[in-house]
From Swiss-Prot:
Gene Ontology terms, MF aspect: structural constituent of ribosome
GO CC terms of this entry: large ribosomal subunit
InterPro entries given in the database record: Ribosomal_bL32, Ribosomal_bL32_bact, Ribosomal_zn-bd
Disulphide bridges: none
Domain of life: Bacteria
GO biological process, alphabetically ordered: translation
Protein name: Large ribosomal subunit protein bL32
Keywords: Ribonucleoprotein, Ribosomal protein
Any single Pfam family the record assigns to this protein: Ribosomal_L32p
Length: 60
């Protein structure tokens, strides 16, 4: 069986474990048509554009 050569220090263990609990940041890009914040590679919910194309009409 595989056995670790050396004991992992408490500092190293806690440092590795802390990454699990870190809050994830959401990537946000700007719509080229209206300038509203939107998720990347998705249709803008404010104006209905994806890139330079109108994908759907937004009900106002």
């Amino acid at each position: 069986m595989a056995v670790p050569k050396q004991k992992r220090s408490r500092s190293r263990t806690h440092h590795k474990r802390a990454k699990i609990y870190r809050a994830f940041s959401v990537p946000v890009s700007v719509c080229p048509n209206c300038g509203a914040p939107k998720l990347p590679h998705r249709v803008c919910l404010n104006c209905g554009h994806y890139g330079k194309k109108q994908v759907f009409e937004v009900a106002e």
